[in-house]
Amino acid sequence: MEDNNMLPQFIHGILSTSHSLFTRSIQELDEGATTPYDYDDGEPCHKTSVKQIGAWILPPLYSLVFIFGFVGNMLVIIILIGCKKLKSMTDIYLLNLAISDLLFLLTLPFWAHYAANEWVFGNIMCKVFTGLYHIGYFGGIFFIILLTIDRYLAIVHAVFALKARTVTFGVITSVVTWVVAVFASLPGIIFTKSKQDDHHYTCGPYFTQLWKNFQTIMRNILSLILPLLVMVICYSGILHTLFRCRNEKKRHRAVRLIFAIMIVYFLFWTPYNIVLFLTTFQESLGMSNCVIDKHLDQAMQVTETLGMTHCCINPVIYAFVGEKFRRYLSIFFRKHIAKRLCKQCPVFYRETADRVSSTFTPSTGEQEVSVGL
């Protein structure tokens, strides 16, 4: 019997100790939020957990996400700047998407430490890392939208795209996008603070009920409804155009990438946004009881952790799917990694570089990033 009880305790310990910048604002950290006796039966709702087990599991999990995401996005940045030289608007958006993921990822080591211990970095750093987390989160969403619009212009309005899709315009729209991401992150930054609670320090937002509702609605609009509308409209036009394309190989490659973008993004982030909405408005929806509250609390931790892993997938979807991008990556490793291991192969490197440069012209490169990245 004792062994049978270990698995549920193990799982519950992982779920209940996961750090969440968003969920604390809608649970026990709100000022004026639900108290243990606010439920209809008048009984206290004790959210017990096996915190030591979660403290063992979550730091390695966050660390793995950080390592894989950091390496993948740094490779994207190196290839875009060092090899592709940022020659198109698509390159600009891909670069900024990788930067968004890096901002998000840089906070994970600190949340890993927080999951195992109390918050020891002070109030200022609590706000700083919360800001980086939110800015990276919103920035990633907005640049996914810009990449979708960029793809739409390149395929559906190819003539207009020749004039509109410039590096200069890409830089301008990227700056505006970062400004919007900062403004979208302000509520989370302003209401977040570190305070002592039950003899240990925490870091999380302390929203009033009004701001809590506003934050949840804004997040669902910006990170779920808006991307969904843009993707449905743009990809409908893209698919209609591609199905008339005579180049069967190019058409299938582009369609595969488009569906990967849609499915992966919504697969990783839609569950979180739904649970966030249900948790915030559970009382209005008639779901205010201890059992449901516990299940939503656990679901919130799982879905946010799932969403956090999306930053590891972005380099694969937006960069490494492209055939010529993979060739650039291969050349980079052979020149800068393998060359240090084998310094007697200069002819091999020169032949590889000549072969790729002969197949990658400005026109073919632009077609690659426009259709298949």
From Swiss-Prot:
Modified residues (Phosphotyrosine): Y152
Cross-referenced Gene3D superfamilies: Rhodopsin 7-helix transmembrane proteins
PROSITE patterns, per database record: G_PROTEIN_RECEP_F1_1, G_PROTEIN_RECEP_F1_2
Compartments in which it is found: Cell membrane
Sequence ranges on the Extracellular membrane side: 1-55, 115-127, 192-219, 282-298
Disulfide pattern: C126-C203
Key words of the record: Cell membrane, Disulfide bond, G-protein coupled receptor, Glycoprotein, Inflammatory response, Membrane, Phosphoprotein, Receptor, Transducer, Transmembrane, Transmembrane helix
Cytoplasmic side: 84-93, 150-166, 240-256, 323-373
GO MF term list: C-C chemokine receptor activity; CCR2 chemokine receptor binding; chemokine (C-C motif) ligand 12 binding; chemokine (C-C motif) ligand 2 binding; chemokine (C-C motif) ligand 7 binding; cytokine binding
Description of what induces expression: Up-regulated in the dopamine D1 and D2 receptor-containing neurons of nucleus accumbens shell after spinal nerve ligation.
Record flagged with keyword Secreted: no
One term under GO cellular component: dendrite
Record note on disruption phenotype: Following a stab wound brain injury, mice show reduced extracellular matrix deposition at the injured gray matter and reduced astroglial scar in the cerebral cortex. The injury site shows an absence of invading monocytes, significantly increased astrocyte proliferation and a decrease in extracellular matrix synthesizing enzymes. Following traumatic brain injury, mice exhibit markedly reduced early macrophage infiltration, improved locomotor activity, improved spatial learning and memory retention and increased neuronal density in the CA1-CA3 regions of the hippocampus.
A Gene Ontology biological process term: apoptotic cell clearance
PTM field: N-glycosylated. Sulfation increases the affinity for both monomeric and dimeric CCL2 with stronger binding to the monomeric form. Binding of sulfated CCR2 to CCL2 promotes conversion of CCL2 from dimer to monomer.
Membrane-spanning ranges: 56-83, 94-114, 128-149, 167-191, 220-239, 257-281, 299-322
Tissue specificity annotation: Epressed in mature thymocytes. Detected in monocyte/macrophage cell lines, but not in nonhematopoietic cell lines.
Membrane topology qualifier: Multi-pass membrane protein
Superkingdom as given in the UniProt entry: Eukaryota
Presence of keyword Cell membrane: yes
Subunit structure: Interacts with ARRB1. Interacts (via extracellular N-terminal region) with beta-defensin DEFB106A/DEFB106B; this interaction may preferentially require specific tyrosine sulfation on CCR2. Interacts with NUP85; the interaction is required for CCR2 clusters formation on the cell membrane and CCR2 signaling.
Function: Key functional receptor for CCL2 but can also bind CCL7 and CCL12 chemokines. Its binding with CCL2 on monocytes and macrophages mediates chemotaxis and migration induction through the activation of the PI3K cascade, the small G protein Rac and lamellipodium protrusion. Also acts as a receptor for the beta-defensin DEFB106A/DEFB106B. Regulates the expression of T-cell inflammatory cytokines and T-cell differentiation, promoting the differentiation of T-cells into T-helper 17 cells (Th17) during inflammation.
Family of this protein: Belongs to the G-protein coupled receptor 1 family.
Designated name of the protein: C-C chemokine receptor type 2
Organism: Mus musculus
